[in-house]
UniProtKB/Swiss-Prot annotation:
Pfam families: RecR_C, RecR_HhH, RecR_ZnF, Toprim_4. Belongs to the RecR family. Gene3D superfamilies: 3.40.1360.10, 6.10.250.240, RecR Domain 1 (1.10.8.420). It comes from Escherichia coli O17:K52:H18 (strain UMN026 / ExPEC). This is Recombination protein RecR. SUPFAM superfamilies: Recombination protein RecR. A zinc finger (C4-type) spans 57-72. Keywords: DNA damage, DNA recombination, DNA repair, Metal-binding, Zinc, Zinc-finger. GO terms for molecular function: DNA binding; zinc ion binding.
Length: 201
């Protein structure tokens, strides 16, 4: 069936979103064109600005349009002395919604995976080590996902913390093994943060 090249292009572009297949992309495209063109324009403008203006925080590596994000630049957060290490910026949103953590973060943008060629420097551990050496950090809370790779990454970081005399703790189990942190409900995540345990070598 022959369709508008622009319509086909729009549907193909929408398929880059997670969980969006051909049918979902088609439904989205027709909805925007048929019922909500102004919403489509707002979406296009927001996407264009986000893609061109959002970068990474110089301290924690999360997404921000500033050099340093609002959390890292907050004096009360700086005085806290705790850093929570997570795998993705989405994990920060999940933890912030619990209201249980008042420190700062460090985003790995992934996890260690030697089979995929992902080493310590690829997930910013050189920057984390620099922060451990230069800043007054009292505790690093390891909130990587409870997967094999996440556990290996947490253990590697715990060893790094030990070299600088910084206490390392792991969030308590309760987060489903093999799950993704951003998908966990707030109550479970609150219990996990409150019941974190120290990692000793």
């Amino acid at each position: 069936m022959q369709t508008s090249p622009l319509l086909t292009q729009l549907m193909e572009a929408l398929r880059c979103l997670p969980g969006v297949g051909p049918k979902s992309a088609q439904r989205m495209a027709f909805t925007l064109l048929q019922r909500d063109r102004s919403g489509g324009m707002r979406l296009a403008q927001a996407l264009t600005r986000a893609m061109s203006e959002i970068g990474h925080c110089a301290d924690c590596r999360t997404f921000t349009e500033q050099e340093v994000c609002n959390i890292c630049s907050n004096p009360r957060r700086q005085e806290n002395g705790q850093i929570c290490v997570v795998e993705s910026p989405a994990d920060i949103y999940a933890i912030e919604q619990t209201g249980q953590f008042s420190g700062r973060y460090f985003v790995l943008m992934g996890h260690l995976s030697p089979l995929d060629g992902i080493g310590p420097d690829d997930i910013g551990l050189d920057r984390l080590e620099q922060r451990l050496a230069e800043e007054k950090i009292t505790e690093v809370i390891l909130a990587t996902n409870p997967t094999v790779e996440g556990e290996a990454t947490a253990n590697y970081i715990a060893e790094l913390c030990a070299q600088y005399g910084v206490e390392a703790s792991r969030i308590a189990h309760g987060v489903p093994v093999g799950g993704e942190l951003e998908m966990v409900d707030g109550t479970t995540l609150s219990h996990s943060l409150a019941g974190r345990h120290k990692i000793r070598f």
